[in-house]
Amino acid sequence: MAVVTLAELLEAGVHFGHQSRRWNPKMFPYIYAERNGIHIIDLVQTAQLLTQACDFVRTASEQGKSFLFVGTKRQAAAVVAQEAERCGAYYVNQRWLGGILTNWFTIRTRVERLKDLENKEESGYLDQLPKKETAILRRELEKLRKNLDGIKTMKRLPDLVVVVDQKRESTAVQECRKLGIPIVSILDTNCNPELADIPIPANDDAIRSIKLILGKIADSISEGNNGKVSSDQEDTQELQTVQ
């Protein structure tokens, strides 16, 4: 059974692609038509692939798998954080630091630094330091929060990654492919569907489009885990060295 109707997709503007001159020919099978120089996405396929993606993440969630949402563009940032938190997924919504996945142990030291500074802030320790030192540490804290807050509780690599705007998040996609982590990706008409395990052809610029699709995926993850946080957030097992 489809998780979304064509009417919902139309209302959210999911069918609007990029200018036809910016297209990736590999998206041809998912394009319905061209109107005034704009590619129109085939929403029948969008609905089918979104349903497939939701079934996939629901099953993974039932198995206790962990998820990472990635979307750093302005239109996606707030929605990515909101929907990830709602279903117990991790997220990166400001800046993808190279090596978050392929060099996780190094990134994890920065996560530990973030936790340390937050503990010092909560305890009042920072306020006891000289003003100049306090200002430096608070700037460091805010920078770490901005980039790492969504993966602060992540103790090992995610089992599945959900990407908004494949072209913008190309580094994240490359890292996933290198490590063999499955990718569910919202793809506009300028993207390459071959780089996603489950491509979802859709407008990746409109907030309503992003929210509709991520919302359906988050709903399915929540259904799979019955509203529980994914098991690895409580997993203290150390990750084996990433080759």
UniProtKB/Swiss-Prot annotation:
What is a single molecular function from GO for this protein? structural constituent of ribosome
Tell me which NCBIfam families the record gives: rpsB_bact
Question: What is the annotated signal peptide range for this record?
Answer: none
Q: Which family does it belong to?
A: Belongs to the universal ribosomal protein uS2 family.
* Entry-linked PROSITE patterns: RIBOSOMAL_S2_1, RIBOSOMAL_S2_2
Q: Where is this region: Disordered?
A: 224-243
Which keywords accompany this UniProt record?
Chloroplast, Plastid, Ribonucleoprotein, Ribosomal protein
Give any Pfam family that matches.
Answer: Ribosomal_S2
Q: Can you list the GO cellular component terms from the UniProt entry?
A: chloroplast; cytosolic small ribosomal subunit
Localization, per the record, is:
Plastid, Chloroplast
The protein depicted here goes by the name: Small ribosomal subunit protein uS2c
Gene name as annotated: rps2
Q: Which GO terms describe its biological process?
A: translation
Question: In which organism is this protein found?
Answer: Rhodomonas salina
